[in-house]
Swiss-Prot record:
Membrane topology: Multi-pass membrane protein
Region spans: Disordered: 289-315, 424-450, 467-533, 618-691, 711-731, 968-1019
Every RNase H type-1 domain range: 1304-1450
Matches recorded under Gene3D superfamilies: 1.10.340.70, 3.10.20.370, 3.30.70.270, 3.40.50.11980, Ribonuclease H-like superfamily/Ribonuclease H
Extra remark beyond the main annotation: The gene encoding this protein may have arisen from the fusion of a cellular gene with retroviral sequences prior to the marsupial-eutherian split. Sequence and structural analyses suggest that the integrase catalytic domain is inactive.
Biased composition (Low complexity): 649-672
Compositional bias annotation for Basic and acidic residues: 990-1005
One Pfam family this sequence matches: Integrase_H2C2
Source species, domain of life: Eukaryota
Biased composition (Polar residues): 618-627
Gene: NYNRIN
UniProt protein name: Protein NYNRIN
RNase NYN domain span: 792-942
Localisation per UniProt entry: Membrane
Amino acid sequence: MLLSGGDPPAQEWFMVQTKSKPRVQRQRLQVQRIFRVKLNAFQSRPDTPYFWLQLEGPRENMGKAKEYLKGLCSPELWKEVRYPPILHCAFLGAQGLFLDCLCWSTLAYLVPGPPGSLMVGGLTESFIMTQNWLEELVGRLRWGPAPLLTPRGIWEAEVTRAFGALVWIRGDQHAGDLLQLPPAVQELLLSLVRDAAGKEDIIEWLSRFGISDSHSDPEVLICPPQQQKEAPAMVSVGESPGPFVDMGTLQNRGPENSKRLSSLGATGSLITAQSTPQEAANQLVRVGSNNQDGMDSAQEEGTVQATSSQDSTNHTQALLKQRQVQKIEDKLLFQPPVSALGVCPPWKAWTPGPAFGPLWPGAIAATFWRINELHSLHLAWLLSQACFNFPFWQRPLGPIQLKLPGQNPLPLNLEWKQKELAPLPSAESPAGRPDGGLGGEAALQNCPRPEISPKVTSLLVVPGSSDVKDKVSSDLPQIGPPLTSTPQLQAGGEPGDQGSMQLDFKGLEEGPAPVLPTGQGKPVAQGGLTDQSVPGAQTVPETLKVPMAAAVPKAENPSRTQVPSAAPKLPTSRMMLAVHTEPAAPEVPLAPTKPTAQLMATAQKTVVNQPVLVAQVEPTTPKTPQAQKMPVAKTSPAGPKTPKAQAGPAATVSKAPAASKAPAAPKVPVTPRVSRAPKTPAAQKVPTDAGPTLDVARLLSEVQPTSRASVSLLKGQGQAGRQGPQSSGTLALSSKHQFQMEGLLGAWEGAPRQPPRHLQANSTVTSFQRYHEALNTPFELNLSGEPGNQGLRRVVIDGSSVAMVHGLQHFFSCRGIAMAVQFFWNRGHREVTVFVPTWQLKKNRRVRESHFLTKLHSLKMLSITPSQLENGKKITTYDYRFMVKLAEETDGIIVTNEQIHILMNSSKKLMVKDRLLPFTFAGNLFMVPDDPLGRDGPTLDEFLKKPNRLDTDIGNFLKVWKTLPPSSASVTELSDDADSGPLESLPNMEEVREEKEERQDEEQRQGQGTQKAAEEDDLDSSLASVFRVECPSLSEEILRCLSLHDPPDGALDIDLLPGAASPYLGIPWDGKAPCQQVLAHLAQLTIPSNFTALSFFMGFMDSHRDAIPDYEALVGPLHSLLKQKPDWQWDQEHEEAFLALKRALVSALCLMAPNSQLPFRLEVTVSHVALTAILHQEHSGRKHPIAYTSKPLLPDEESQGPQSGGDSPYAVAWALKHFSRCIGDTPVVLDLSYASRTTADPEVREGRRVSKAWLIRWSLLVQDKGKRALELALLQGLLGENRLLTPAASMPRFFQVLPPFSDLSTFVCIHMSGYCFYREDEWCAGFGLYVLSPTSPPVSLSFSCSPYTPTYAHLAAVACGLERFGQSPLPVVFLTHCNWIFSLLWELLPLWRARGFLSSDGAPLPHPSLLSYIISLTSGLSSLPFIYRTSYRGSLFAVTVDTLAKQGAQGGGQWWSLPKDVPAPTVSPHAMGKRPNLLALQLSDSTLADIIARLQAGQKLSGSSPFSSAFNSLSLDKESGLLMFKGDKKPRVWVVPTQLRRDLIFSVHDIPLGAHQRPEETYKKLRLLGWWPGMQEHVKDYCRSCLFCIPRNLIGSELKVIESPWPLRSTAPWSNLQIEVVGPVTISEEGHKHVLIVADPNTRWVEAFPLKPYTHTAVAQVLLQHVFARWGVPVRLEAAQGPQFARHVLVSCGLALGAQVASLSRDLQFPCLTSSGAYWEFKRALKEFIFLHGKKWAASLPLLHLAFRASSTDATPFKVLTGGESRLTEPLWWEMSSANIEGLKMDVFLLQLVGELLELHWRVADKASEKAENRRFKRESQEKEWNVGDQVLLLSLPRNGSSAKWVGPFYIGDRLSLSLYRIWGFPTPEKLGCIYPSSLMKAFAKSGTPLSFKVLEQ
């Protein structure tokens, strides 16, 4: 969500309907809270049905709120969504935070119902976004936790801690359920909050983000704090000045409300126990502090005395001064201040409250780090460690003490970028009481005091049954540099003092380590933020006189003790333990009881706090030199000279001493071992089951010695350096490294503890001194100018990481960057880029040798990421996003030691994982590992090389295999739950692997080194089961003999490539001798074991040396072995030679040399163990193998293949690449199968369900030869033909294009133009020529011509110019400003000549004689004439020639006609498809078949038949047996079957012949073609439902009802459709982000269309152009996005076509899409297709359609309608959608059908008038056809919200059918464009305007 100050507030007004006003009023408060805008409603007039809403706030917030209100007032969808009830806490927990964030993100109206139910409403997009989010949430519920030691496990640990802190802050009764959710679910919820917070600081955002409570006051949630303080009740406690509390005026001022305050959970809000949440929201609590006069401002009844010998007199007097606080009755009473983070009540007793509403305490800013970056650097990490590392119900009931360093940042994990700890402005916290006692409050304020040592705030986590106090001790050690601001707890003190607070506590820690006394004794990981700590003790300076502020337990007991603050000057060498308890009697001083022990350690210069375990008591006696002992929780007694700590009642020890006179506080359970531990000697060793302890020496060695980070050490008086055993609940981590180890992995239970070491400090040379000395060594960046290695990757260097590592994490060493650049430059890299943020370039004492950066910047090798400094805060962009983006786009590697965790879970996860190159420095030596990705990964040289993408994928494929479900033989048998299949099969694979190992062991025991016949049989069956398909002409015996060692799983490694054919062996492998005998002998030859066997093998091979290529080279190693007869030794070299000879002979005998005239067939089989590929050709009906290969596949333990099911494409790609030498560019027919070895029983294998083998379809997608070349190969492979189409580049040209800027002074320039217009019901045409020649004056010519078409006029001008000026000695150039005629002469004329002057539908082109005449004229010239297209139509020559053309068309010139002696070209139109069988079509209709049978048998129809009323008019044709109908005064016509009726109407109504005429004219023409019952009504319904009659016939604001031409419950193709929008996906090169899937469930036809915008209009346009234009609106439309989405799509169709108002017919059905079974397989392949093709997926999408059509066993829609199949002569997959291809096939069929019907009706006509009408209809249909060269207008569908409009005119460049045309100039001007349906076209109007090309309207 936006920052409140990010954008200036703005206002926006919009209207909603009045009926929605109550709904808006109910949701007004929620809108203001979630979107942080102000919402007001205004009624304009009482009589208007609308009212105004005013939004005020940031613009982005207003935009979101507006969309939310639109969905609220006019919801498009309102539906219940179900989910697992376990996720119910995600919607109600955290006080509604996640629900509000989900509402912010999706803008949906969300109403949680019972567990497992959520009502979702709003706009369609909002509903879909919510539904998708819920699906992902439910999907993540099944994710199991990752192993702890894996990167994912480390990440999940971070997520769990962050989530725990968030739940802690927003705690309610659902907190326990939230914390039990899987880490993946928690991660998604955290990302939801992160996205909602946006760029705003998460802490500030949570402070302003209210609680989802319908009873809370909404105005408080949105008003600033100053607006909420209305008449505050000031309650001052203590003397002035001091901490004060401002309480907002309570709405209920009853005495009960004013007496008590209850703390609800860990909210930190002070509210009354009985006050309502609304009252609580109005309360304002402000806690301040004052440190003047050294006065303690919190004065309470009771006295406490303390003395110190080292303080000054005035301080002593001030501290010894007794203070008394007047009893406060009927007023608010406060306990001593407690940190808000210290409260840990049991969750079952957690009272929900307005946790952190508009005025949540600022101290929580230190408890929760920035969730949007997930950097665990703040105290919430400590908190989550303390309370969330074990189940919620098992958290410690005892107090948990934490420490927050005041001016120190917490230790950093090296895997994260360093972040500064946010200052703590304030802190509030209640201490939970069993009796609901009121809590305390403290203020954390920024009081930077450089002259005073940094403070450490000791925070306490105490359950609701404990009293809690807080303190600040000064001079506590810290690690790391201080911050600029120090949050301090202040409770008064001496002048200049920071103040201190005293609290009762169970655990104590000094330094930055938390103490967790748990009931189970488990050590809890605290992130390594502190030293070692021991619960039960608290250290304060020994010289202190520390009277502490005691606690007020109840309102009824106001007596308190008070302790003054410490003096400002405190020594750091001596510390004492101070433990306090609370007396029951108000005025009785505490009696001394058994003292506690204190452990100390010393060092000379660097000292560290050593925390110990002591009881919690209060000092009463000033000086006690001797040490006193008392039972403590597993604490050893200190030395005899250890300073004594005074002890009061051991309130927190489970077994308190009997001598304690003061009643103890409620007992707190501690570790049983701890409570029962006796006095342990100091030398006693620590038990191994205790938690890990602190290695102080390591801590000291790893802490950076800075001037500000001095560390103090407890100094004893004798036993210096001795350290006692630590509590099992203690965890201490020392440094950043330990933080990295245990902060992420957590502490292990039972981990061995390191023995304590004696601390000694020495004054050796530091690393910083060594670094500065190294800088004195000169270094120069010398980048040589020699060319580098072009095969190396780009290197992207993380400059900050390299510089900081070389600078010891303290200096930004630019020399380190230069060394890294020099290292890669020397290796040959010339593409090196260094990324450095801008602020590192500024002058800074930590930036060393910046001149290296200057030089790199001058060499264009330095990229500076933008950043800025505002108010001392660095605002920088994320450098790693730049690095990852550059590495992704350039295929480079990233040099960094960071793990880039933020990107590891994004789409770049795999890329980032495989591109990181770690490094280190050894002094001034830059070093990188030789195996960057591990010892199993590539070497450094391979890592730095540019990879071959295909080789990389193939390499990955050959190393991995996917485990298929045992029950399926192929991937296609996976059902919807296929994702769980591989997981379930993993145990089975382990069993198989174990059985395999057992079987191998048994075989080895039975006989090693011997081959038995039984084993050979097993191997044969194994091979048969692996390959499944019998290898053609390659017996398994031969294949087995080619492997030296028989693998137990049958995975052979064989490679047979064809060699030169042997002349004396005859035809290879003809099944006869000598081949059969040779192979039989060869199969028996095994590895020679002695000299005799080797000699026999050599003799055998020598007899066939003529058949083996390179025989001498192959046999060389074996010949040399023969010479070593006495002591010969068989080694690897001889094995390879032996195998090479056998393979060469088998290849010569079994393989045929490839024939380039025959197509190849490639069979690829992928089994669980091997990849087998066979390349063969068919000749004389037999398969002849060309090449063979078999490769074993290595198992992958993690089962991580390239992609799910993605192995097979890589297998085919590898086979094609492997056989490329044999294949070349010859077309290949691909076949792919997936073998399964789950069973060897052939009956079981045959009994399995035959799958559709979607992997077979995938095999068509991997030939990477370019789209056109691949198209040709696929065409030949699918059609089984061996005829290559002529490429366009090799076609002969008849004109040549004149280059631009040519000198026209040496040319005969012929300016030409044609003109055509309509006058007095007739066409007139003419052309003009204006000729300029360097040897003669200009010539002007005008001609008239016929036929009267614009294309003919232009062509006639060209022919006339060639006749008159073609024989000129000078070259001739034709100049025209008509783009159409230029494209015709240059591009189309050669293509038409190659086609035989036929269009794509097989019909003759217009004017073939004129085209042939022009070709003959150009071929007779010595050089081809030139053509040139002028760009300016208004030039003098263009205007002149246009005028001449008009004169010629008007009859003002000569008459030009084609010479009569020109031979006409032979044009042979061919019919596309076979003649339809009319009788078979009728018999395919069961109703007509029954009527024909009854007529043949002489029976009558039943009364229920639709033909019963017309039975007497039905008859059978005597010749053909066709069923005919004879109506009154009508000719006999054919009875049309049911499946063809709608398409027959289409052929009359929609094509140019019908031109969308009225129903009466359509019925009149259709009646000449056939008849069926109810025909006239059917025609009326069709014309009424025709969408494309709208732009022609719709008048004004007429309402258009969207109807379907299909009857209800129709099962015909295209009558029912299913649609789904998939995405967003990888953005294509054209900008497509989504994919529209359209499926016909009846025929299982599926198609996908790329989408740029995901809108109803975009989907409607695609459906209009590709589906509805040919097949009409379906009667049933199912959408995965919901019924409302489908309705909007159809309404958008009507609006896009020009209707003013569109409504939907009641007959249309919009059910919910319950099953995607029709296209789930296609959808799965689509995702992998996009993954495989990357950004080119949209352009390559036709490949996916073609692949699925090629091997689909389902009947196509065309086959369902006609009963047969049709093939197209041209490949149209790239230009047309599959729906239009099916329509094209249907158009061809209907054209043939109409011709057959006209011939049939003319033959059976009884009257001459009937025959004449038949011929007239045939002639008229031919005359009204559109031909190539005609001009038409196109209906351009709306763009950017505009309405549809007719644009043009455009020329028809080609005709595919009567309803599909290829348009020239649309959508790309001057190019042969897309294929357009005739329903979106109309003829250009007949007028006097010239029919010339117009640019497409924008």
